[in-house]
Amino acid sequence: MLYIVATPIGNLKDITLRAIEVLKSVDLIACEDTRHTKILLDHYSIKTSTTSFFQHNRFTKGEYLLKLLQQNKNIALVSDAGTPGILDPGYNLINLAITNNIPMTFIPGPTAFINALVLSGKPTHRFIFEGFLPAKAQAQIGRAHV
């Protein structure tokens, strides 16, 4: 089973009890940066082994993680902050799981763009999310509308 686990985006206390429970019970945690995730795991005394899964190893590590999932191992996928699969390489493992009929479950939690949307004070019944703005200021012109 692949557990897609949202993690705090700033305050370590912004994590669900279910997320802590899952992170303690799985066989392995796949994370963008093991050093970053270790801070969260240490805070909650979670001793589960971790492995890195990031942009530059997503193909080789993805195949390794897929083999473990096919051996009925339970793996939690986390991002450095927020929800895996949103603007991070987690979508690659999620896609592999879907393609290979691996069961998945989602452990919801913080998502930065939802927080920004709510804090905008604007109506939230319709919105478009296009990811990160371009790095150059000139390219940002006309892209962000609130």
PLM segments and residue spans:
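Short, acidic/small-residue loops that bind anionic groups at enzyme active sites
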Residues: 96-116, 127-133
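Short Gly/Thr/Asp-enriched flexible loops that form oxyanion-binding sites at enzyme active sites
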Residues: 85-100
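Loop/turn-to-beta-strand initiation segments
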Residues: 1-2, 72-76
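Short glycine-rich anion-binding loops that position phosphate/pyrophosphate groups of nucleotides
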Residues: 9-10, 80-84
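Glycine-rich, flexible N-terminal cofactor/catalytic loop recognition
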Residues: 1-55
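Conserved helicase motor
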Residues: 51-60, 132-137
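Beta-strand/loop-alpha-helix module characteristic of Rossmann-like adenine-cofactor folds
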Residues: 5, 115-143
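Short phosphate-binding loop-to-helix
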Residues: 55-70, 89
